[in-house]
Amino acid sequence: MTSVNAVLLGLVQAAGEFLPISSSAHLVLMPWLLGMEYQGLTYDIFLHLATLIAVLIYFRKEWFTIIKDGLTKPKTEEGKILWLLVLGTIPAAICGVLFEDWIETVFRSPFVIAAALIVFAVILHLADKRAGQKDVALNVKTVLIIGCAQALALMPGVSRSGITITAALFLGFSRAESAKISFLLSTPIIAGAAVLKLKDINPADINAAFIAGFLTAAIFGWLFIKFLMNYVQKHNFNIFVVYRIALGVIIIITALMK
């Protein structure tokens, strides 16, 4: 793998992980569209570790408080957040352990990915209209709904950030609250997935290109988080809806022409 390819894949991972456009769809489609070979599990793990570092650094103050309060005063409203986030991770974790390999095999078709991009873009658009319409809080019910929605992101094209933001918007959270919940909920699931796969890392695969991709994913991951958190303060999610639909249409046309 060249350094250019590594940087490109790192950039795609960073954008797709934190923007509601589906990193898995882009990483699956790039080899198909551009003729790039699959870079292997070691590189996938490196990219996920990079995005984990990005979200931990950006929300370092929040996570410090969440963990401290969760361990020292778990019965308070502040202390419950840690355990709610853990609870919200369970549905996706269970589905990932049981069905990830099957899902990645069955749903890697370009047509399926395109359909997921388009269908869930429309759902995001509908949810966006409900942003901030209710006085809602993070509790067992809301976090389980968002957590169950997160499990759908195992299918390429759905988007983990997209589906969790969509679920939060449908519940009545504001756009900024929905994005923050999505990012906080992503931390344990990304960490868990990376830790489970660490044993599969082949040190012989690690080279300068891998490091370049890792740094790209970490740096741009942080930048994309910052961008989205600022963007949703004044804008809706329509730009991502349009992008997803356009990409889905392009994929379908390209697949039919091949």
UniProtKB/Swiss-Prot annotation:
Main location: membrane
Name of the protein in question: Undecaprenyl-diphosphatase
Family annotation (InterPro entries): UppP
Function: Catalyzes the dephosphorylation of undecaprenyl diphosphate (UPP). Confers resistance to bacitracin.
Organism: Elusimicrobium minutum (strain Pei191)
GO CC field: plasma membrane
Membrane topology value: Multi-pass membrane protein
Keyword line: Antibiotic resistance, Cell membrane, Cell shape, Cell wall biogenesis/degradation, Hydrolase, Membrane, Peptidoglycan synthesis, Transmembrane, Transmembrane helix
Similarity comment: Belongs to the UppP family.
Entry annotated with the keyword Transmembrane: yes
Entry GO MF terms: undecaprenyl-diphosphatase activity
Cell compartment(s), UniProt: Cell membrane
EC nos: 3.6.1.27
Transmembrane intervals: 14-34, 39-59, 79-99, 106-126, 136-156, 176-196, 209-229, 237-257
One Pfam family it belongs to: BacA
Superkingdom of origin organism: Bacteria
GO biological process, one term: cell wall organization
Note: Bacitracin is thought to be involved in the inhibition of peptidoglycan synthesis by sequestering undecaprenyl diphosphate, thereby reducing the pool of lipid carrier available.
Catalytic activity: di-trans,octa-cis-undecaprenyl diphosphate + H2O = di-trans,octa-cis-undecaprenyl phosphate + phosphate + H(+)
